[in-house]
Swiss-Prot record:
NCBIfam families: atpA, PRK13343.1. Produces ATP from ADP in the presence of a proton gradient across the membrane. The alpha chain is a regulatory subunit. It is a peripheral membrane protein. Belongs to the ATPase alpha/beta chains family. The record marks S363 as: Required for activity. Signal peptide: none annotated. This is ATP synthase subunit alpha. Its EC number is 7.1.2.2. PROSITE patterns: ATPASE_ALPHA_BETA. It comes from the Bacteria. Its main location: membrane. ATP binds at G170, D171, R172, Q173, T174, G175, K176, T177. It catalyses: ATP + H2O + 4 H(+)(in) = ADP + phosphate + 5 H(+)(out).
Length: 506
């Protein structure tokens, strides 16, 4: 007969009582009613928030966007091939966030902060919400520091300041991305963190940009956020906000940052696709009613912070692609009204051989003038006017048989200025070189140089200054002012180069 030992039974009961785990997990769950085209309709999820992350049975993540009477409309941030009707969906209680920190520099990530470059873990410990409020009025300061692009035409006539939003707009294949990449390359040794956001682009194009930045040593201070053409619409829609969050981290640490959104037309299309599939009412050009807010809340995050906030800045260069030069379409007009100016690229100028193909007449920088360095501001004042007058005269002179000497001189000056502003891709110029080139053109010091040799003159003048007058370059780079002493040095250099060129030509 088995003897029952009460002490043993009581010991076991005590042990079980002590080990009893009282924690209760409450999860908000629902089930899939319908799925397809990157959208899922979910029944249940009673307590879900707008914009909350939800997790499907197969591990795919989504965002709850439409909260309706009897269902929730969620967009999928993955393929979602394993999601079926009746699959369970769990609300996570979290809003989409992205890892931030120095570990992101030199890396390629997707809009959720997942590395795409095969270099392993990002090594970051902090994260930021993808959607963050823009800095308030008191936290801001007016734009007053220059953001040099290295492109003479922009730095002289359409200057950009730190904390500004400057739109780059033009048809496809007019060099919009090239201007953005040149600007990143020009930030070398300037202690500026750059974020390049590729939205809906070919994976090959993103790889090419990454390679260009790596070859020229610019990837060390750049983060690339890529939502390729093959990615779901939800990721293409989120990509710019991710880029802004990464830049904000550095901005609030007191650093200057530069963000390029390439391009917001594709983000608007992705948002339109999501909205129409969620059965939201369409507006003009079938875009949803809040597409303006979609872009304004993104671009308002760019700012120059006050001294109390650490003096950081975020400069935004959004890119918009137009169709046949139509800047009066819905998305272009929206973004033009949000930004502080635009650089308009013309396909006609591009095809005529003018690179960068900037149409100076309708390009403008509304706040950059306050940030422009004194050296180039002093000499570039008349440049924009002279080029605008030249364009007008050139159109008129096609119909005139004989022109007076003054008109011929003005046409000749305009042609030479046009040639001076030509610049090959991936070769940004430092401030001193820009000052030298613009000075020579505006002051009429190269009126005797044949038009077809102006590009050569520009190259030789830069080489001459580097080898024979390094003190001029040093003076301009440090003082940022064209002093009488520096002006004398520059005049001597221009005279020397032009006389040598004319002598060899003869």
């Amino acid at each position: 007969m088995v003897s029952i030992r009460p002490d043993e039974i009581s010991a076991i009961l005590k042990q079980q009582i002590e080990d009893y785990d009282k924690s209760v997990s409450v999860s908000n769950v629902g089930s899939v009613l319908q799925v397809g085209d990157g959208i899922a309709r979910v029944y249940g999820l009673q307590q879900v928030m707008a914009g909350e992350l939800v997790e499907f049975e197969d591990g795919t993540e989504g965002i709850a966007l439409n909260l309706e009477d009897d269902n929730v409309g969620a967009v999928l941030m993955g393929e979602g091939l394993g999601i079926q009707e009746g699959s369970t969906v769990r609300a996570t209680g979290k809003i989409a966030s992205v890892p931030v920190g120095d570990g992101l520099l030199g890396r390629v990530v997707n809009p959720l902060g997942v590395a795409l470059d095969g270099k392993g873990d990002l090594g970051t410990t902090e994260s930021r919400l993808i959607e963050s409020p823009a800095p308030g009025i008191i936290q801001r300061k007016s734009v007053h520091e220059p953001m040099q692009t290295g492109i003479t035409a922009i730095d002289a006539m359409i200057p950009i300041g730190r904390g500004q939003r400057e739109l780059i707009i033009g048809d496809r294949q007019t060099g919009k991305t090239a201007i953005a990449i040149d600007t990143i390359l020009n930030q070398k040794d300037q202690d500026v963190v750059c974020v390049y956001v590729a939205i809906g682009q070919k994976a090959a194009s993103v790889a090419q940009v990454t390679e260009v930045l790596r070859e020229r040593g610019a990837l060390d201070y750049t983060v690339i956020v890529a939502a390729n053409a093959s990615d779901p619409a939800a990721l293409q829609y989120l990509a710019p906000y991710t880029g802004a969050s990464i830049a904000e981290y550095f901005m609030y640490k007191g650093k200057a940052t530069l963000v390029i959104y390439d391009d917001l037309s594709k983000q608007a299309q992705a948002y339109r696709q999501m909205s129409l599939l969620l059965r939201r009412p369409p507006g003009r050009e079938a875009y949803p009613g809040d597409v303006f807010y979609c872009h304004s809340r993104l671009l308002e995050r760019a700012a120059k912070l006050s001294d109390a906030m650490g003096k950081g800045s975020m400069t935004a260069l959004p890119i918009i692609e137009t169709q046949a030069g139509d800047v009066s379409a819905y998305i272009p007009t929206n973004v033009i009204s949000i930004t502080d100016g635009q650089v308009f690229l013309s396909s006609d100028l591009f095809n005529s051989g003018l690179r960068p193909a900037i149409n100076v007449g309708i390009s403008v920088s509304r706040v950059g003038g306050a940030a422009q360095t004194k050296a180039i501001k002093k000499i570039a004042g008349t440049l924009k006017l002279e080029l605008a007058q030249f364009d007008e005269l050139a159109a008129f002179s096609q119909f005139a048989s004989d022109l007076d000497a003054a008109t011929q001189k003005q046409l000749g000056r305009g042609k030479r200025l046009r040639e001076l502003l030509k610049q090959p891709q991936f070769s940004p110029l430092i401030l001193a070189e820009q000052v030298a080139i613009v000075y020579a053109g505006v002051k009429g010091l190269i009126d005797d140089v044949p038009v077809d040799q102006v590009v050569q003159f520009s190259r030789e003048l830069r080489e001459y200054l580097k080898s024979n007058k390094p003190e001029f370059i040093e003076k301009i780079q440090t003082e940022k002012v064209l002093s009488p002493e520096a002006e004398t040095m520059l005049k001597e250099a221009v005279a020397e180069v032009t006389s040598t060129m004319l002598a060899t030509a003869n």
